[in-house]
């Protein structure tokens, strides 16, 4: 018997394509923003707005990326809407017909005027990632806090207030 190891097939070096890099960075940004929203009180619900992907595709048109739409009275706990894997934008405040920050986390919270611009959708982040006990493990989302408008910041001192 030979003690030499069997020759292994050499795997070709595969460099990630632009599409791979774009989608992975989009997922990372989405997760950080979702987590910031969750820390503001939404838990497994976030208020989402359709927008353009970095590639220029419009989420309204691209069926594979669009979430199912929710009725105007739906909100956390009532919405049948689900979040597609590549939702590009999250609403950072209660402006321009978006979901009200004060309504986050309330069962049956109504959508604000401007139906169709912003909808309640389930977050793709596991519920346990949004729990208060895990907040300290997601410090990488800190730069996003500065970009959030006043209503999203908690007055407890955990986040800066306006």
Swiss-Prot record:
GO terms for molecular function: complement binding; enzyme binding; serpin family protein binding; small GTPase binding; structural molecule activity; zymogen binding. One of its GO terms (biological process) is viral translational frameshifting. Residues 1-23 are annotated as: Disordered. It comes from the Viruses. The keyword tRNA processing does not apply. Residues 14-23 have a biased composition (Polar residues). Disulfide bonds: none annotated. Its main location: host cell. It is found in: Host cytoplasm; Host cytoplasm, Host perinuclear region. InterPro entries: HCV_core_N (IPR002522). Pfam families: HCV_capsid. Keywords: Host cytoplasm, Host-virus interaction, Inhibition of host innate immune response by virus, Inhibition of host RIG-I by virus, Inhibition of host RLR pathway by virus, Viral immunoevasion. One of its GO terms (cellular component) is host cell nucleus. Contributes to the RIGI-mediated inhibition of type I interferon production. This protein is very unstable. This is F protein.
């Amino acid at each position: 018997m030979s003690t030499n190891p069997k020759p292994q097939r050499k795997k070709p070096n595969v460099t990630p394509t632009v599409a791979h890099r774009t989608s992975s960075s989009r997922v990372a940004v989405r997760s950080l923003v979702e987590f910031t929203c969750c820390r503001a009180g939404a838990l497994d619900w976030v208020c989402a707005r359709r927008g353009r992907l970095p590639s220029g595709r419009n989420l309204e048109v691209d069926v594979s990326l669009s979430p199912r739409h929710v009725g105007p009275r739906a909100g956390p706990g009532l919405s049948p809407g689900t979040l597609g894997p590549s939702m590009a934008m999250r609403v950072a405040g209660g402006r321009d017909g978006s979901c009200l920050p004060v309504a986050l986390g309330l069962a049956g919270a109504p959508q604000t005027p401007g139906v169709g611009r912003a909808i309640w959708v389930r977050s793709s982040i596991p519920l346990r990632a949004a729990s208060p006990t895990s907040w300290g493990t997601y410090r990488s989302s800190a730069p996003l806090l500065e970009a959030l408008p006043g209503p999203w910041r908690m007055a407890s001192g955990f986040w800066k207030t306006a």
